Amino acid sequence: HLVNSPRTGSAFHVFDDFPVENIKRIEIIRGPGSAVYGENAFSAVINIITFDAKDIDGIKISGGYGSFDTEEGNIVFGKTYGEIDISGMARYRHTDGFDGIVERDLVTQIDTALAPLGFSPASQAPGRVDDWREEYDLNLKVAYKGFYVEGLYINKNMGPFISPQFALADESNIEQNYVFGEVGYKKTFDEKFTIRPRLYYDQFEWNNYVEALPEGAHVPLDTDGDGKTDKIN
């Protein structure tokens, strides 16, 4: 399934935190691969191969804690019951992110300019950048005699680090969702020829709410274009 987001062309928005505990191997195929992997595979292809039931044969549980109150837990499982293979993973990760302090921001400058006019300050500086992140990953695959059903769901929520107006604000949330589902059949003949008909669905979704300025901030406006402030909003 597609790793690169069709919106940005990059894999670093959704898969930058993909759990390595669920990766069996990484394939790097150099050179053009458009005939097999689509029109964008004109220089190389990187395939991420995840574990199947026979690779795991049980349950692996891992977790960690680190700087900036970073915590995560990961479960990888796989088992064969007769001719039925079941495998998957569940993972949670949260971090407060970099705790850098912004001493002054755009709203600080506006507050300074408007203070003689009696406007109350609204800047949240000095304050921390908004670099938190929270992620859920779920994957499940069931296979029987070459037939299989598989699904993946990734949900990310994060802060923007700082607002697009270079001001501290505390109500922003950048949410990214990725989901795929697939039903198919795979048959290999003498390890040289494989047939794999399949039906699949991929969806990338962005739900962003970015607070440009903190509550109570005032914006000087030049409504008539003469270079002078004539309105404060």
Spans of features found by a protein language model:
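Membrane-embedded beta-strand positions in outer-membrane beta-barrel channels/transporters
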Residues: R25, R30, V45, K60-S62, ...
